[in-house]
Each structure stands twice: as structure tokens, then as C-alpha cells.
Amino acid sequence: MILYPAIDLKDGQCVRLLRGEMEAATVFGDDPAAQAAAFEAAGCEWVHLVDLNGAFAGRPVNAAAVEAILARIAVPAQLGGGIRDMATIALWLEKGLARVILGTVAVENPGLVREAARAFPGRVAVGIDARKGRVATKGWATETDVMATDLARSFEDAGVAAIIYTDIDRDGAMAGPNIEATDALARAVSIPVIASGGVSSLADLLALRDTGSIAGAISGRALYDGALDLTQALQALRT
């Protein structure tokens, strides 16, 4: 299982939100590129980036910070937030992102996801953010009646590289991931599923790994708070 350290970008700074609330942002640093370099130095295989302003605005907002990160690191990076058309997808992939994550548009325009996955094989992921099993969009501000598992299954034949599943109520809360829901989603599809939200300890990571169904896990706050040691976690996942 791959561990993806997370860098959430708000106003050019590295922050973490509590349950997706922009007003509940904790600033962890004003040099996201240095943070990405530190994650790389610790041995991570990937970096997970989120343009929080972009998720709410529907367009890239923290482009300068993302480009600075891409210039600093050699490991692959994936980005979500505000990516809602083919031009933006193509631009980010040309700029050096390994993978883009499509969230809101996966609900509102699933045809775009299919088109992008065909155009850029292996480089398009779907972000499914759910509260009590129902998908939320537009930076989690809009709740839908779409069930997360149904949305995931709808992309089974689309060629997407991965599904990033976030349990909103666990995100940034240090309350542990929703292992049961994530495992159920992962077993419902053949697409690799990456867990996000609530990872607060090495035990949480190992519990996700031990399901045998989950391909990766994203962690942010636990790394910044020191509850999870990145080097130790990476070592544990490799054994």
C-alpha cells in the first residue's frame, strides 16, 4: 500500500482543514515546495496536492504554489481541486503532474472523466468525497443524493487510474479512517482505491493495509502534528 503525504493549499500556504471547513484551517507553513521536498527526502513515493481555493472557485487558484512544488521534487504528484475541463487537465499534465483528480466534474459531467481517461491513460483519477455514504461536491459545500459506491461503479469501464475516497466527517479530525466504508467501496470495484480522511496513527495505516483491498492512503494532519512519523510509516508499509 502506498502512503501519499498531503499538501493542502490555501492562499499559497500549506494548511489542513477540519471536516472540509475553510474557516477551520490550520496553517502549517508558508513554503509548500519546501514541505514537498521534505516529504521526498523522507522517502515518499508520491505527493498528494489539493488546491482548496480551486475546489471552491471551480478553477485553479494556487497554480504558482503547485508549479513551485513540481519544480522542487522528482517523485510523482497528483492534484485535485478546481480541475473541471479538458484544457485545465491537459495544462496540468503538461506542467508535470503525474495525475489529476477529478471530483465535482465526476458527478456533474462524467463524460469528461471518460474523455480525459482515454486521452491521458493512467493519469486521471476520480475523487469521491462522501458524507454518510452520499457524495458531496464543490469543495464539499454541496451535498448530493448520489451514493459513493454507485458513482465508483459507474467508472468501472472508464479507464481511470484510481479512486480517491474521502470520508468528510473523518477528514482532519484525527478520529481514525472509516475503514469499513473504504474497504466496502474498494471491494465493489476493480479500480484501485486510495483512502483519505482520518488517518491519525501508524495503527490506522496498518489497519487500512490489512484489509487487503485498499491500494493507498493519504495522510496530512497526522504528519504535521507529529502523530505519524513519515519515515517510520513508509518503512512499516514496506515490510
Swiss-Prot record:
Gene Ontology cellular component terms for the protein in this record: cytoplasm
Pfam families: His_biosynth
The entry's keywords: Amino-acid biosynthesis, Cytoplasm, Histidine biosynthesis, Isomerase
Catalytic reaction list: 1-(5-phospho-beta-D-ribosyl)-5-[(5-phospho-beta-D-ribosylamino)methylideneamino]imidazole-4-carboxamide = 5-[(5-phospho-1-deoxy-D-ribulos-1-ylimino)methylamino]-1-(5-phospho-beta-D-ribosyl)imidazole-4-carboxamide
GO molecular function, a single term: 1-(5-phosphoribosyl)-5-[(5-phosphoribosylamino)methylideneamino]imidazole-4-carboxamide isomerase activity
Keyword Cytoplasm carried by entry: yes
Active-site residues, record numbering mapped to chain: D8 (proton acceptor), D129 (proton donor)
Pathway in which the depicted protein is active: Amino-acid biosynthesis; L-histidine biosynthesis; L-histidine from 5-phospho-alpha-D-ribose 1-diphosphate: step 4/9
Predominant cellular place of this UniProt entry's protein: cytoplasm
Naturally occurring in which organism (per UniProt): Cereibacter sphaeroides (strain ATCC 17029 / ATH 2.4.9)
UniProt similarity note: Belongs to the HisA/HisF family.
Subcellular location, record wording: Cytoplasm
A single GO BP: L-tryptophan biosynthetic process
EC number: 5.3.1.16
Name of the featured protein: 1-(5-phosphoribosyl)-5-[(5-phosphoribosylamino)methylideneamino] imidazole-4-carboxamide isomerase
